[in-house]
Amino acid sequence: MLQPKRTKYRKPHNVSYEGKAKGNSYVAFGEYGLVATKGNWIDARAIESARIAISKCLGKTGKMWIRIFPHMSKTKKPLEVRMGSGKGNPEFWVAVVKQGTVMFEVANIPESQMIKALTRAGHKLPVTWKILKREEVSA
Protein backbone atom coordinates (compact mmCIF):
# COMPACT_ATOMS: atom_id res chain seq x y z
CA MET A 1 0.00 0.00 0.00
CA LEU A 2 1.04 3.57 -0.59
CA GLN A 3 2.31 5.74 2.23
CA PRO A 4 5.04 8.37 2.58
CA LYS A 5 8.54 7.27 3.58
CA ARG A 6 8.72 10.08 6.12
CA THR A 7 6.70 13.17 7.01
CA LYS A 8 7.51 16.39 8.79
CA TYR A 9 4.56 16.00 11.18
CA ARG A 10 2.84 12.79 12.34
CA LYS A 11 -0.60 14.28 12.95
CA PRO A 12 -1.62 16.96 10.44
CA HIS A 13 -4.71 19.15 10.65
CA ASN A 14 -7.68 17.97 8.61
CA VAL A 15 -7.40 19.37 5.09
CA SER A 16 -10.68 20.26 3.40
CA TYR A 17 -11.68 18.50 0.20
CA GLU A 18 -14.31 21.15 -0.61
CA GLY A 19 -13.93 23.30 -3.72
CA LYS A 20 -12.22 22.70 -7.05
CA ALA A 21 -8.75 21.34 -7.72
CA LYS A 22 -6.07 23.95 -8.43
CA GLY A 23 -3.78 21.60 -10.31
CA ASN A 24 -3.91 18.03 -11.59
CA SER A 25 -7.14 18.77 -13.47
CA TYR A 26 -6.37 17.59 -17.00
CA VAL A 27 -5.22 14.33 -18.60
CA ALA A 28 -1.47 14.82 -18.97
CA PHE A 29 0.10 11.41 -19.68
CA GLY A 30 -2.47 8.89 -20.94
CA GLU A 31 -5.35 8.96 -23.42
CA TYR A 32 -8.21 8.61 -20.90
CA GLY A 33 -8.42 9.66 -17.26
CA LEU A 34 -10.65 9.05 -14.23
CA VAL A 35 -11.75 12.41 -12.78
CA ALA A 36 -13.45 13.09 -9.43
CA THR A 37 -16.69 15.07 -9.77
CA LYS A 38 -16.95 15.58 -5.99
CA GLY A 39 -14.24 15.80 -3.36
CA ASN A 40 -13.40 13.27 -0.67
CA TRP A 41 -10.54 11.63 1.20
CA ILE A 42 -9.40 8.45 -0.56
CA ASP A 43 -7.43 6.05 1.61
CA ALA A 44 -4.45 4.01 0.45
CA ARG A 45 -6.44 0.75 0.39
CA ALA A 46 -8.97 2.18 -2.05
CA ILE A 47 -6.19 3.50 -4.31
CA GLU A 48 -4.51 0.09 -4.26
CA SER A 49 -7.72 -1.80 -5.10
CA ALA A 50 -8.41 0.60 -7.99
CA ARG A 51 -4.84 0.10 -9.23
CA ILE A 52 -5.31 -3.69 -9.20
CA ALA A 53 -8.65 -3.37 -11.04
CA ILE A 54 -7.00 -1.30 -13.79
CA SER A 55 -3.91 -3.50 -14.08
CA LYS A 56 -6.07 -6.61 -14.65
CA CYS A 57 -7.55 -4.95 -17.77
CA LEU A 58 -4.28 -3.53 -19.14
CA GLY A 59 -2.45 -6.57 -20.44
CA LYS A 60 1.19 -6.33 -21.53
CA THR A 61 0.98 -3.23 -23.72
CA GLY A 62 -1.23 -1.04 -21.54
CA LYS A 63 0.17 1.75 -19.40
CA MET A 64 -1.26 3.29 -16.23
CA TRP A 65 -0.48 6.44 -14.24
CA ILE A 66 -1.62 7.01 -10.64
CA ARG A 67 -1.97 10.78 -10.21
CA ILE A 68 -2.89 10.84 -6.49
CA PHE A 69 -0.83 9.86 -3.45
CA PRO A 70 -1.91 9.44 0.21
CA HIS A 71 0.24 12.10 1.90
CA MET A 72 -1.99 12.78 4.91
CA SER A 73 -2.39 10.54 7.96
CA LYS A 74 -5.78 10.19 9.61
CA THR A 75 -5.89 9.65 13.35
CA LYS A 76 -8.32 7.59 15.39
CA LYS A 77 -8.77 7.08 19.11
CA PRO A 78 -9.11 3.49 20.38
CA LEU A 79 -12.55 2.03 21.06
CA GLU A 80 -14.15 2.71 24.45
CA VAL A 81 -11.76 5.54 25.31
CA ARG A 82 -13.14 8.69 26.90
CA MET A 83 -12.88 11.99 25.06
CA GLY A 84 -9.97 14.27 25.80
CA SER A 85 -6.36 13.39 26.62
CA GLY A 86 -5.01 14.36 23.22
CA LYS A 87 -5.40 13.40 19.62
CA GLY A 88 -5.49 9.72 18.61
CA ASN A 89 -2.73 7.80 16.86
CA PRO A 90 -2.31 7.74 13.06
CA GLU A 91 -4.37 4.81 11.71
CA PHE A 92 -4.28 5.12 7.90
CA TRP A 93 -3.16 7.39 5.06
CA VAL A 94 -5.43 9.37 2.75
CA ALA A 95 -5.16 11.42 -0.43
CA VAL A 96 -7.14 14.66 -0.45
CA VAL A 97 -9.08 14.65 -3.74
CA LYS A 98 -10.99 17.77 -4.77
CA GLN A 99 -13.56 18.19 -7.53
CA GLY A 100 -11.89 17.95 -10.94
CA THR A 101 -8.79 16.02 -9.82
CA VAL A 102 -7.51 13.43 -12.30
CA MET A 103 -6.90 10.27 -10.26
CA PHE A 104 -5.84 7.63 -12.82
CA GLU A 105 -4.81 7.67 -16.48
CA VAL A 106 -4.46 4.83 -19.00
CA ALA A 107 -3.07 4.44 -22.52
CA ASN A 108 -1.86 1.96 -25.19
CA ILE A 109 -4.93 -0.33 -25.23
CA PRO A 110 -8.17 -0.20 -27.26
CA GLU A 111 -10.63 2.55 -26.31
CA SER A 112 -13.35 0.17 -25.09
CA GLN A 113 -10.85 -1.59 -22.83
CA MET A 114 -9.63 1.73 -21.37
CA ILE A 115 -13.19 2.77 -20.52
CA LYS A 116 -13.87 -0.67 -18.99
CA ALA A 117 -10.69 -0.49 -16.86
CA LEU A 118 -11.44 3.02 -15.57
CA THR A 119 -15.07 2.10 -14.84
CA ARG A 120 -13.97 -0.88 -12.74
CA ALA A 121 -11.48 1.31 -10.87
CA GLY A 122 -14.10 3.99 -10.28
CA HIS A 123 -16.40 1.53 -8.55
CA LYS A 124 -13.67 0.91 -5.95
CA LEU A 125 -13.37 4.60 -5.00
CA PRO A 126 -15.51 6.59 -2.50
CA VAL A 127 -16.03 9.53 -4.89
CA THR A 128 -18.34 10.22 -7.79
CA TRP A 129 -16.34 10.23 -11.00
CA LYS A 130 -16.39 10.55 -14.77
CA ILE A 131 -14.12 9.38 -17.57
CA LEU A 132 -12.30 12.13 -19.45
CA LYS A 133 -10.61 11.99 -22.84
CA ARG A 134 -7.28 13.74 -23.30
CA GLU A 135 -8.64 16.60 -25.46
CA GLU A 136 -11.54 17.39 -23.11
CA VAL A 137 -11.29 19.78 -20.16
CA SER A 138 -12.60 18.73 -16.71
CA ALA A 139 -14.72 21.71 -15.66
Swiss-Prot record:
Protein name: Large ribosomal subunit protein uL16
Keyword terms of this UniProt record: Ribonucleoprotein, Ribosomal protein, RNA-binding, rRNA-binding, tRNA-binding
Ribonucleoprotein as UniProt keyword: yes
PANTHER family reported in the protein's UniProt record: 50S/60S RIBOSOMAL PROTEIN L16 (PTHR12220), LARGE RIBOSOMAL SUBUNIT PROTEIN UL16M (PTHR12220:SF13)
SUPFAM superfamilies to which the protein is assigned, alphabetical: Ribosomal protein L16p/L10e (SSF54686)
Entry coiled-coil feature ranges: none
GO biological process terms held by the UniProt record: translation
Similarity-based family: Belongs to the universal ribosomal protein uL16 family.
Species of the source: Mycoplasma pneumoniae (strain ATCC 29342 / M129 / Subtype 1)
GO molecular function terms listed in the Swiss-Prot or TrEMBL record: rRNA binding; structural constituent of ribosome; tRNA binding
Biological classification of the source: Bacteria, Bacillati, Mycoplasmatota, Mycoplasmoidales, Mycoplasmoidaceae
Pfam families referenced in this protein's UniProt entry, alphabetically: Ribosomal_L16
InterPro entries: Ribosomal_uL16, Ribosomal_uL16_bact-type, Ribosomal_uL16_CS, Ribosomal_uL16_dom, Ribosomal_uL16_sf
Biological role stated in the UniProt entry: Binds 23S rRNA and is also seen to make contacts with the A and possibly P site tRNAs.
Record GO cellular component, one term: cytosolic large ribosomal subunit
Subunit and partners: Part of the 50S ribosomal subunit.
